[in-house]
Amino acid sequence: VQNTTPKVALITAAALNGAIGIENRLPWQLPDDWAHFRRVTAGKPFVMGRKSALAEDALLSDTRNLILTRQAQPALPPGCEPVPSLEEAARRLAHEPEWFILGGAEVFAQALPIANYLYLTLVNGFFEADAFFPFHQLRWAEWELLHSVRREPDDRHRWAFAINEYQRRR
């Protein structure tokens, strides 16, 4: 019997204090984390909130971008499809073997219960932010760490960070 459950993955970078953004941009620059993001998400559909889609540093999928919005006729970047709810996005992507949820904070909070994978880059620092990952909702006992790569600061990365991949325990 073939497993037809899609891989629904949250992907984010968060600081030790949960910071994921300030004024609709990332609080840090981590080129190797961007490269990891592009590598694991290549060719996969994305789901994100409207503000994330409109961010200056937004990365859009070359496959499909579903944008969660309550607005009837939102101004969105080309190639983006508005959807009224996460449930509707999941319905539209039911045939996809894998798709990614990119945030922001409110979307992550809604999506945690349905996600079965988590790509979490943990940035070793505390940052001023106005958007935070909902760590308080994450039940760590439900997640198994599959892979972790730690990076120390260098000439391209001001902060240490760890790229972690988790799978929800069955």
Model-found features: residue ranges?
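Enzymes that bind and transform nitrogen-containing heteroaromatic metabolites
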Residues: 1-170
